């Protein structure tokens, strides 16, 4: 049986993810929460521009209607 999108996101809990926003911003951090509206909570969040960290945050909440994509990240 095919997985549903929220099942894939659930498997990413407590793992590093990359969140792409509609305005072109990218955040990387540990996914510690989400809901059915794709509001996400990241711990140790970082703002990424051109592949480089430009600002570090602690815990942040990103409103779901700003999210374009959410992807697991494998850190080296």
Swiss-Prot record:
CDD domains: archaeal_Sm1. Keywords: Ribonucleoprotein. It holds the Pfam family LSM. One of its GO terms (biological process) is mRNA splicing, via spliceosome. PROSITE patterns: SM (PS52002). One of its GO terms (molecular function) is RNA binding. InterPro entries: Lsm6/sSmF, LSM_dom_sf, Sm, Sm_dom_euk/arc, snRNP_Sm-like_arc. GO terms for cellular component: ribonucleoprotein complex; Sm-like protein family complex. It comes from the Archaea. Residues 4-76 form the Sm domain. Belongs to the snRNP Sm proteins family. This is Putative snRNP Sm-like protein. It comes from Thermococcus kodakarensis (strain ATCC BAA-918 / JCM 12380 / KOD1) (Pyrococcus kodakaraensis (strain KOD1)).
């Amino acid at each position: 049986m095919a997985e549903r999108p929220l099942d894939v996101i659930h498997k990413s809990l407590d793992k590093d993810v990359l969140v792409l926003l509609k305005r072109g911003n990218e955040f990387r951090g540990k996914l510690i929460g989400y809901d059915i509206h794709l509001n996400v909570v990241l711990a140790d969040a970082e703002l990424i521009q051109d592949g480089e960290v430009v600002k570090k945050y602690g815990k942040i909440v990103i409103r779901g209607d700003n999210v374009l994509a959410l992807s697991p990240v494998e850190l080296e």
